[in-house]
Amino acid sequence: MLFRSGALQLLLMTQPHRKTVRLGIKKVFQDGRRRVFVWLKQFAQMQLGEKELTASPLGPPSALTPKPGRQRDPAKKLAGWNLAEAEETRELITALGRSGRPILIGPWLSEAGFELIYWIPFLAWAKAYGNLDPSQLVVISRGGAASWYRDITTNYEDVLSFYSPDEFRVRNEARIVEQHGRLKHVEICSFDREIIAKVSEKRGLSGVRLLHPSTMYRLFDHFWFQRVPITLIEAFTSFAALPPVDLGDLRGGLPERYVAAKFYSNTGLPDTPENQAFVASYLEELTRHIDVVLLNTPHRFDDHSDIAKANRGRIHTIDHLMTPANNLDVQSRVIAGAEAYVGTYGGFSYVAPLLGTNALTFYSHITGFRFDHLELAKRVFSGLRKGSFVELDVRSVDLIRLGFGALHDEFVAKG
């Protein structure tokens, strides 16, 4: 006991000296390494005829830096890069790129918001990192989202070409139960395997490899559960605007100028009498200035129901143009051709700024959505500089009107 006590006292007494020695050794090592790098650079310059070495051109500005559009120092590793899931993801993507086999991507079965700001940018990163051949890739999604993936690959299969909307909803709900209530696609479930088998059979594929959404979810869970900062998302995504689409054969059935509108109920804008009254009043006021095209769909794929109803005059509907397998394509084209987009704040509203259309969205319950998804989306939109995006509490609408002088006459009358 006396010996251990004396040893501890000796360690405490010599701690400052040992720290000084450690720092000195570290400084000597760093100085030596710096001198070696300088010597290597000078040697390389002599071998290249004394030409000054220049750095490789930087990639495109990041959408997620504290100031959007700023360049990151390429020599710095972003937080989260060395996570076990990060290393597994890089190894998987590298193996897929070297496999020489067909690669099925998906199936994507859940909400559009995550698909737009996480899944598709993650795939863009994976394609570049693994040097994936677009001809080897087959994307599987639902609802006619092929145009969203055009920069990844033109090979696309739609789940709703294999299942009716009711079958899809029932099977997707069973998938959620199989995942113990989790909506996010965190596991490869029996429904996934069935879809993969159908796609493989249709295309005559064998020995396929799979890039499943669960890979992304396992990795990005560290950000969503606030274990690491947003730099994890930056390290494993490549953000870009959606590929351009045009109205095409839809043009003849639409007004020359219009605003696209999609009001549906969710936890941020629930289907209450107050919200129904707000939407009806807002659309009535909007149609005094411009035609409105409602993006209501005739089919129900999840627990979201439309709030806005067609009534008369300058409000137009396009539900007769949509099928289960093309509804996202039709809505995307209508949004791309619109003067602006208005509607419920939610994941679908991200389509508008990603297609270059300005968006004004509404919510009534601020506790009905997560701010981290909204913050990331707004940073992406600001960095891309395509379409602007505004989310507004319905209680603030009158304040905005006042700010622009719309209520001036009422205040004069009251005075």
PLM features: what roles do these ranges have?
Residues 101-104, 258, 340:
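Structural motif
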Residues 86-95, 100-204, 330-333, 348-351, ...:
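Active-site and donor-binding regions of nucleotide-sugar-utilizing enzymes
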Residues 349-415:
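Nucleotide-sugar donor-binding patch of glycosyltransferase catalytic domains
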Residues 1-2:
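Short, small-residue-biased leader/transition segments that mark boundaries at the very start
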Residues 144-161, 304-313, 372-379:
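Short, aromatic/basic amphipathic alpha-helical patches
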Residues 182-264:
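A nucleotide-sugar donor-handling region in carbohydrate enzymes
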Residues 336-342:
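Acidic donor-binding loop of glycosyltransferase active sites
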Residues 256, 261-266, 276-328:
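Catalytic donor nucleotide-activated moiety binding site of glycosyltransferases and closely related
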